[in-house]
Amino acid sequence: PLAILSASLSIMHPSLYNASHQAMQQLSEWSATNDPKMAAALRHWPTIYTNISMIANRSAPLHRDLQSHADWYDMLVSVSNYSECVLDIPSLGLQFDYWPGTVVAFSGRLLRHGVNDVSGNCCSLAFYMRDNIHNWLGVPRSDWMRVPLVSQALAGM
């Protein structure tokens, strides 16, 4: 199922997908020589994103994700069994029902966001990339996503 996130990113932000794909390839090549345990783990890594964090049974006050880059899309995936959770993005004046199974992609650095405290077992997975990993690997940073880039990507399919 996590391959769907990577495939979604390839449509929503093709240049970010390509940059991350290049980063993961280079990381695999580097680790094959320098860190066999990392190489073994990367063979089973489920997504194009370089980082995954799990947030369990807690609210997330409004914040920005400063380790990411403003023009990159992070993905939040909610799982578990809970109700009445709201994802708040106040700078856009948006509040979303954040039910189990919801996937949201946006710039976690650019947009302040947070979720309320809920009853039940609440778990979210945050998929993101770290600028320092891309810089260390020498992978060029992707550009801002623009509508013409999506049109070009879809035309090439």
Where are the regions that the model predicts?
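Catalytic core of Fe(II)/2-oxoglutarate
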Residues: D71-W72, N81-M157
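Conserved, ordered domain cores of eukaryotic regulatory proteins
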Residues: P1-A70
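Conserved, well-structured core segments
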Residues: D74-L76
